[in-house]
Amino acid sequence: MTPPHFFLSLIKKRCICWICLEESTYDSTWLQHTCGCNLQIHKRCYIRWLYQMHVELFLPNTVDLPKDADLPIITCLKCLVDGHHDFMTTFSLTEIWETRPIWGQKSVPFQNDYVFNLMSLYTKRDNHPPYVLVKFGECPQCKKTNFIKRPTVTIQSSVLSLFYQWQKITRYVIPLGITSLFLLNPEKTSFDIGLWQLRCLFPENVLRNMLNISTTKALDVYAQTERGLLSIPLTSSIIIYGFIHYLSNISNVSANAILFKWVYLSIVKTAGNKYYKGIGLPKIILYSNLATFCYNFTFKRLVDLIYRRLINKGGKYLYHGNFENSSNSVPAEEFFIRRNWYAILAEKILWPFVGKCTGGLLLNAFLWIQRKFKIEWTPNCSPSEFRMIFNIIGCGTAAIGWSSLKLYASYKRCQELEKINEFIEQSCKGE
């Protein structure tokens, strides 16, 4: 009887690297030619080939060269193989497409896209020559230059992949959304976003009294015209327009942010006391401020301490930008995974919705525990107000969970950078 591994060996493809002539089974360490030729090459061999090619091009005299003269070439190779290199990119390609449409009208090979990304890297570096990889070799058989896929090195991490996909999505969606919505009618868009966020957290009866209006559906009608927006009471407009700014600065401890939050919450408190007689909004504001205070001075400080230790351990593997030697240039939480304006804006817009979903899960868990252990307790508020409390708790829980995920993603990113560094060093030095 034929053993099963005999059929498996027939399925597995055997390859010969045309550089080192080594034969083995095709796996993730190989690169297949995309030019149509039946050729394969090791990732390490391809990187070593590129390294030697650029050393001969930029460093022809290797006798009197200073130490680390090839560091720019090695840095470019690290960026080339980094499967998550967009973590360190400080601009959105969508912004470029909107100003230079030709980038969106043709398929750009990885070499051109890579050079385009590297140009932004070296515009801010002062300690290395501003050159990038200019040659990527050619197929020995058909002589095509665009003959191979981009070699990448990554680690298996679902959390890191989640953050990478989230950053890529926001990089395209937010700039396009701002162009199509904010630039066409920024006032209406800001009003709609603020009202939608308030509806995610507060029930209808609370919003009716807080915003001094018979029904919030009327606000949708008012928002259709400029005259309708002007007819909305000033206090209500401030609450709606300022809500997203309040969320953006809720954990900010700067003087301007504290002043803005104090003024905004004073307006909300005054409106709540004047028009709403249900559950006390001042108590909700007080507890929210206490929770924010505890978050800033306990959890956030603990997270920053962990980030500092992570930077001290893995900061040497960071190859991008000019901030690796200055820890004050960027926040500690952005040292390994940069957050751009579009990612921050998307987080603040979706935060109330995520908090509402999280609060719903917490409420269901609370009711299940109450039924499971037969706890006799009735809250002194309406069901919609009780749900509002859990929505606010859900926002805090979502913020803590998101910060924890970012910390873990930074930890995995540090491991990935270490793996990339070892791969390039071993490939270039021939180890």
UniProtKB/Swiss-Prot annotation:
It is a multi-pass membrane protein. Its main location: membrane. It is found in: Membrane. One of its GO terms (cellular component) is membrane. It comes from the Eukaryota. The keyword Transferase does not apply. The chain crosses the membrane at residues 228-248, 279-299, 349-369, 388-408. This is Uncharacterized protein YMR187C.
